[in-house]
A protein has these predicted regions:
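Soluble, non-transmembrane catalytic domains of enzymes that act on hydrophobic metabolites at membranes
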Residues: 2, 62-64, 79-83
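Structured catalytic core of nucleotide-sugar glycosyltransferases
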Residues: 4-6, 58, 72, 84
Length: 130
């Protein structure tokens, strides 16, 4: 299952966004208001929970400065990645788009497609708060 957020233009440099997203504690700023839990688990991982959803642990998987950051599920039960692609538009402007890729059975995919789609849209929409 592949989902993508709308591309969002931010008045920050690509390097600034990359550095901000490289620090996992900054993801709390991006979370939707319906967040029930957010906890940093070391330098490269965090766990979060949204109301009515199971808690999810994310771990930093890959960083390619200043254009790409990949987070992945720390559990193999629900394997997925969340990738942030950062494009430099000008010296102080960037475009960010989030991509969610996961391997789920059709029933699970049907249940989570809506909530996950809204979730990555919210994360992208909150990028200007960084």
């Amino acid at each position: 299952m592949n989902l993508e957020s709308p591309k969002v233009t931010i008045e920050k440099s690509a390097q600034y966004l990359f550095d901000s997203l490289s620090d996992v504690k900054n993801f709390e700023t991006l979370m939707p208001e319906s967040i029930a839990k957010f906890e940093v688990l070391g330098e490269d991982a965090f766990i979060f929970g949204l109301k009515g959803m199971p808690e999810i642990k994310l771990k930093m998987k890959e960083k390619v400065a200043p254009n790409k950051i990949v987070l992945g599920a720390a559990s193999d039960k629900l394997p997925f990645t969340l990738t942030a692609n950062i494009d430099s538009v000008s010296e102080n402007t960037s475009a960010v788009q989030l991509f969610f890729e996961g391997e789920f059975n059709p029933m699970m995919a049907m249940m989570i497609k809506g909530p996950i789609g809204k979730f990555i849209e919210t994360l992208a929409g909150n990028m200007n708060k960084l």
